[in-house]
Design a protein with these regions (language model features):
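Positively charged, low-complexity terminal tracts
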Residues: 1-111
């Protein structure tokens, strides 16, 4: 049976907050000047504000949660492709980012 209500409250630790904050800020910088990404700009700026707050529990909307999950999954796929093509040193750098993103996805967005 499908759940009727989904909980969009998240408790990120300090490191996860920092990673997500930089991730959202980078996304904002990339799409900042394009009018066709108005909805995404609104979502990611809201996410940055919520991650900057000192609250323990962060309440996301359904759109924010879905967009963040989608972007993290896309980033994981991109990093896996880049790692397959890169040399040892780059793989080493990408591996830490990849594991951090995968941990966030598995801990907070799966199930």
């Amino acid at each position: 049976m499908k759940k009727l209500f989904t909980n969009y409250n998240f408790e990120f630790n300090k490191n996860e907050k920092k990673i997500l904050k930089t991730f959202c800020s980078q996304n904002l910088k990339q799409i900042q000047n394009e009018n066709k990404y108005f909805a995404e700009i609104k979502i990611f700026s809201s996410l940055v504000e919520k991650l900057n707050s000192s609250e323990e529990v962060i309440k996301l909307t359904k759109d924010e949660r879905n967009r963040l999950k989608l972007q993290l999954q896309e980033n994981v796929n991109y990093l896996k492709k880049k790692m397959a093509k890169s040399w040892f040193l780059k793989k080493l750098l990408y591996k830490s980012m990849l594991t951090q993103y995968e941990n966030i996805l598995s801990n907070h967005f799966e199930g």
